[in-house]
């Protein structure tokens, strides 16, 4: 019986990691569908990997930036709404994800 309990607990972190990886893949797929352009998707994929590793709960310790896109004062908890808001922000401020990524490379933020 003890061996069975140890097996269950030893597998728990792997189950959590798999579901998190699946979630991240779903967030990326959703973003790709929103953008359609493969080059622009690749830029936002790199940008948000740098910013949050696609974690919808990511918090910036130096500012109020939060979520996948690391938007200042973001209150939205839903990852898909975070993505929508992040893409809207990029379009308003930088026009394209590739321009946002270039800005990030030069300044360390976008």
Positions of predicted regions on the chain:
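Export/targeting segments at the very N-terminus of extracytoplasmic proteins
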Residues: 13-54
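Core subunits and conserved enzymes of cellular information-processing
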Residues: 1-19
